[in-house]
Amino acid sequence: MPFACYFFIFINVGLGEGSALPVGVPVPWPSATPPTGWLKCNGAAFSAEEYPELAKAYPTNKLPDLRGEFIRGWDDGRGIDTGRSILSIQGYATEDHAHGLPSRSTIVTDATINFYFDEIWVNSGTDIIKRGNTNDAGLPAPDYGTFKTYKQSVDGLGAAASETRPRNIAFNYIVRAA
C-alpha cells in the first residue's frame, strides 16, 4: 500500500496527536513500520522518562511481545480461564479429549482394555499371528479376530501443522507511545 494510503488511514482514524485512543492500547497495524509516535509490541524495553504515560500502562517499562500471538480477554472472575493475571503469557495447549477406538473386546472397564499400536494381529484360521511391530513389550496376545494399526494424526488432511490455531491474518500490533 502506498504511503499516501497509510497517511490517509493515520489521519482519518485519529492515530496522530490528540488521538482518542489511550496511550498503551495495542492496535493492529497493516504495515511493518509503525506511524510516528507509535511503537511495535515486540517485547522491547522503553524509557519511562521518555514515555511516562506508556510507563503507567506498562510499569515494567517493557512492551508485550505480541509477534505471532493472539490477544485473549482477561477472565476477571468469569471462570473460563482462571488463575491468570493481566499481561500474563499462556503457552500452547490442545483441549484434553478422547477418541473411541473400535474393538470387539468384551471387557467393559476402560482401565483394563489393552490396545496394540503399530502392529496387526491376523487370524490365519488356525492361529492368531502378529504382523508388523513384533516387540510386544510384554503385552498379552489377543484371543480374537484382527487388530488394526491405529494412528492418531491429521497429517494429510490438509490442515496439519506444528501448532493448533484458528484461521487468522497477520497484523503488526503497535501502541501509541505518548
Swiss-Prot record:
Question: What protein is this chain from?
Answer: Putative uncharacterized protein StfE
The UniProt entry's sequence similarity note says: Belongs to the tail fiber family.
The UniProt entry, under Pfam families, shows:
Collar
The disulfides recorded in the entry are none
Q: Which organism is it from?
A: Escherichia coli (strain K12)
Q: Does the keyword Repeat apply?
A: yes
Is Repeat among the key words of this record?
yes
What are the alphabetically sorted keywords of the record?
Repeat
